[in-house]
Regions:
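Active-site-facing substrate-recognition patch
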Residues: 1-64
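Nucleotide donor/acceptor-binding cores
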Residues: 28, 66, 124-126
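Long, contiguous hydrophobic alpha-helical segments, chiefly transmembrane helices and signal peptides
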Residues: 23-25, 33-38, 50, 71, ...
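N-terminal start-of-chain detector that recognizes signal peptides
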Residues: 3-8, 98-101, 126, 130-132
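Sequence-level detector for tyrosine residue identity
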Residues: 6, 28, 33, 100, ...
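PRPP/pyrophosphate-binding module of the type I phosphoribosyltransferase fold
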Residues: 92, 105-162
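Conserved PRPP/pyrophosphate-binding segment of the phosphoribosyltransferase/PRPP-pathway fold
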Residues: 40-119
């Protein structure tokens, strides 16, 4: 039987989450709800709306960011977020700066790895971890360990849903 989805509006704007009730198992947990963030991850209009909400929630005003590390398939949202955070008209300490958008690469052992040509985007940089959702924190922990391994500094953690 296919789960029945409900739309739940989130805060302000056009962003809504599709939620299904039931029993769902992930690698790290069991949950009673499945939150589908596919539209926010792949539709530019919804990605821009999600990025706008994230940027307005104090990410832009108080957090210096050099690199956005996009995890869980959030690269489209990360690109939109970098654009919002660097806009001159938006109240942001990142206005006019360059922000790199980097997606995760998972090695055969499950660790996050980056090629030599991408390391400069992490080493000594202020990094924002961007995730689709946070339930147990294990993905966040992997992201933090990766940033520390590449000698970056975790500036913050943002999720579409937590």
């Amino acid at each position: 039987m296919e789960p029945r989805f409900y739309k739940i509006p989130v805060c302000v704007g056009d962003v809504s989450l599709r939620v299904a009730k039931g029993h769902f198992a992930t690698r790290n947990s069991h949950t009673n709800y499945f939150v589908d963030v596919t539209n926010q991850q792949s539709c530019i209009r919804e990605a821009e709306a999600a990025a706008q909400q994230l940027a307005q929630r104090n990410l832009s005003q108080h957090m210096m960011v050099d690199t956005i590390l996009c995890m869980d398939g959030t690269r489209v949202i990360g690109t939109c977020l970098a654009q919002k955070m660097t806009q001159g008209g938006f109240r942001s300490i990142n206005a006019g700066r360059e922000i790199y958008v980097l997606r995760e690469n998972v090695g055969s052992n499950g660790q996050l790895i980056f090629r030599d040509n991408a390391r400069f985007m992490l080493e000594g940089k202020n990094i924002l971890l961007l995730l689709a959702s946070v339930t147990t924190g294990s993905t966040v922990r992997r992201g933090i360990q990766c940033v520390q391994y590449y000698q970056g500094k975790v500036a913050g953690i943002a999720a579409i849903y937590s």
